[in-house]
UniProtKB/Swiss-Prot annotation:
Name of the molecule in the record: 4-hydroxy-3-methylbut-2-en-1-yl diphosphate synthase (ferredoxin)
Cross-referenced Gene3D superfamilies: Dihydropteroate synthase-like, Sulfite Reductase Hemoprotein, domain 1
Role summary: Converts 2C-methyl-D-erythritol 2,4-cyclodiphosphate (ME-2,4cPP) into 1-hydroxy-2-methyl-2-(E)-butenyl 4-diphosphate.
Species assigned in the record: Gloeobacter violaceus (strain ATCC 29082 / PCC 7421)
Database matches in InterPro entries: Dihydropteroate_synth-like_sf, IspG_bac, IspG_bac-typ, NO2/SO3_Rdtase_4Fe4S_sf
């Protein structure tokens, strides 16, 4: 279960208006919640391994799963993967990741997945050339893109399936680099070119991503894209992510810095936190970002002071015990405060409060109301009992 934070709409900028795009049973954009997605590491030719990885991600909360499709054989394997999922588990919305010379691969895989991701810099792959680009060269390149893209657009449109135009900073076409340089403008124009062709072909089931590995570049390009595309009436949803963010604490910090900044601006409709780790570890970070911004409530929101000389109990230990006892609940705000100074005032928005009163004694609050004082040794147990008495407890 998830809820929206009632405080958030009044504090954050209005969310960018985007057209809803259907991806299987999911909706990306419009008024739909921000969608969480990830990508499996397994070879798509390994059907049992791929199915197991997709299931594990989906059970962990990943709503949209991407798989790599580097060849026609991999594209055909998606038929087996999808059927196995439906027969042994349940339908899971799938995205196929297509890159170099992607036309034939994308056409095949479009039959088996809900969305196809193409990379504008590689979809019609041409080796770098020497010399200038004339206007005729540019128009010839656009004609080649249209020729390659039209069959895919026709197939996807006939099935009401989606496409992600996924621009990467590190793989802009040589033509775009020549015209615009290695700039956010070049990334945006790379996406705009493909959007224009799709629109000319009457296809609008589009999601757009513009990823970079440097957070300032990523933020700048999405902000520019929102401005330029919206000015042209291209109100397509955005997929946010910092590509190649790395691992560990810093990888999470980089992803959060980029994704959360844009979401706080009202930009973004689906997110992926890309880590050089097991993809399962990406999912809690995604939901943590959305929870912190109040965009989705999928867990308890904990408020706790950082501790100081006034603290009347071991705050770190008690917070851990409270979290372990209540972490399975959804939509509650629980505050753990070390003393009365930071207690009632700082936890005014909390549903329940656990506050140090005197040495060895804590006070439990419901909202702003002090309910009872109990020995510290029984504090967590008494908090659980209070939640149960209010009918807001569910067994884990």
């Amino acid at each position: 279960m998830q809820t929206l934070d009632p405080v958030t709409p009044a504090l954050l900028p209005l969310r960018r208006v985007t057209r809803p795009v259907q991806v299987g049973a999911l909706t990306i954009g419009g008024n739909a919640p921000v969608v969480v997605q990830s990508m499996i590491n397994e070879d798509t030719l390994d059907t049992p391994g791929a199915v197991a990885a997709i299931r594990a991600l989906h059970k962990a909360g990943c709503e949209l799963v991407r798989v790599t499709v580097p060849s026609l054989a991999h594209a055909r394997a998606l038929e087996r993967i999808r059927k196995t999922l439906e027969d042994t588990y349940r339908p899971v919305p799938l995205v196929a990741d297509v890159h170099h010379d992607g036309g034939p691969i994308a056409l095949e895989v479009a039959r088996h997945v809900d969305k196809v991701r193409i990379n504008p810099g590689l979809f019609v792959f041409r080796r770098a050339r020497l010399g200038d680009y004339t206007a005729e060269d540019v128009e010839r390149a656009r004609a080649q893109i249209r020729e390659e893209l039209k069959p895919l657009v026709d197939v996807l449109g006939a099935q009401d399936k989606a496409m992600r135009i996924g621009v990467n900073h590190g793989s802009l076409s040589e033509r775009m680099l020549y015209i615009h340089g290695d700039t956010p403008e070049g990334m945006v124009q790379s996406a705009v070119e493909f959007v224009e062709i799709c629109e000319q072909l009457g296809y609008h089931n589009l999601v757009i991503s513009l990823k970079a590995s440097r957070v300032p570049v990523m933020i700048a390009v999405y902000r520019l894209a929102a401005k330029l595309l919206d000015a042209r009436g291209m109100h397509y949803p955005f997929h946010l992510g910092v590509t190649e963010a790395g691992d560990g604490e810093y990888g999470r910090i980089k992803s959060t810095a980029g994704i959360a900044t844009l979401l706080a601006d009202g930009i973004g409709d689906t997110i992926r936190v890309s880590l050089t780790e097991d993809p399962l570890k990406e999912i809690p970070v995604c939901y943590g970002i959305l929870q912190a911004l109040g965009l989705r409530r999928t867990m308890v929101e904990y408020v706790a002071c950082p501790s100081c000389g006034r603290t009347l109990f071991n705050l770190e230990t008690v917070l851990h015990r409270v979290r372990e006892a209540t972490r399975h609940l959804t939509g509650l705000n629980i505050a753990v405060m070390g003393c009365i100074v930071n207690g009632p005032g700082e936890m005014a928005d909390a549903d329940y409060g656990y506050v140090g009163k005197t040495p060895g004694t804590i006070s439990l609050y419901r909202g702003r109301e002090e309910i009872k004082k109990v020995p510290e040794a029984r504090g967590v147990e008494a908090l659980v009992d209070l939640i149960k008495s209010d009918g807001r407890w569910v067994d884990p």
